[in-house]
Curated annotation (Swiss-Prot):
It comes from Fervidobacterium nodosum (strain ATCC 35602 / DSM 5306 / Rt17-B1). The lineage of its organism: Bacteria, Thermotogati, Thermotogota, Thermotogae, Thermotogales. An aminoacyl-tRNA editing enzyme that deacylates mischarged D-aminoacyl-tRNAs. Also deacylates mischarged glycyl-tRNA(Ala), protecting cells against glycine mischarging by AlaRS. Acts via tRNA-based rather than protein-based catalysis; rejects L-amino acids rather than detecting D-amino acids in the active site. By recycling D-aminoacyl-tRNA to D-amino acids and free tRNA molecules, this enzyme counteracts the toxicity associated with the formation of D-aminoacyl-tRNA entities in vivo and helps enforce protein L-homochirality. One of its GO terms (biological process) is D-amino acid catabolic process. This is D-aminoacyl-tRNA deacylase. Homodimer. Keywords: Cytoplasm, Hydrolase, RNA-binding, tRNA-binding. SUPFAM superfamilies: DTD-like. One of its GO terms (molecular function) is D-tyrosyl-tRNA(Tyr) deacylase activity.
């Protein structure tokens, strides 16, 4: 399972011109599910993300987590995180999970993050979305449950 985590001052996601999710201070999580992922990957990333110390403390050091600052999370599915661009010019998505598994683990990830007491907004799984992100810093991190990077 892969995630792009961005610290934001605000963010929103729209489908067909209508906002379906929006947050103020917090994080945007673009989440991709791989074909070999399971519940353990979901648990690992959820715990890791809510506890990442990427928010500034009073001394201006990144020392506080999403939980510490009581921030929100906007979680959006993004299968293209498994795009393999090593050969040719068109990405291959053969490492992405099938839609059924991807939806199941995406929804479980949302449930787990909410279980930490985080206010969560979401996009719509498999929909064509427009995402507006006001990246704060900018702070952008790449995470992989298999620790590839």
């Amino acid at each position: 399972m892969r995630a792009v985590v961005q610290r934001v001052t605000k963010a929103s996601v729209s489908v067909d011109g209508k906002i379906v999710g929006q947050i103020e201070k917090g994080i945007v999580v673009l989440l991709g599910v791989g074909k070999d992922d399971n519940i353990d990957d979901t648990k690992y990333l959820a715990e890791k993300i809510v506890n990442l110390r990427i928010f500034d403390d009073n001394d201006g050091k990144m020392n506080l987590s999403l939980l510490d600052v009581q921030g929100s999370a906007l979680i959006i599915s993004q299968f293209t995180l498994y795009g393999d661009c090593r050969r040719g010019r068109r990405p291959s998505y053969s490492d992405s999970a099938n839609p059924e598994l991807a939806k199941e683990l995406y929804e479980k990830f949302i449930e787990l993050v909410r279980g930490y007491g985080v206010h969560v907004e979401t996009g719509i799984f498999a929909a064509y979305m427009q995402v507006e992100i006001h990246n704060d810093g900018p702070v952008t991190l790449l995470l992989d449950s298999k620790k590839v990077f």
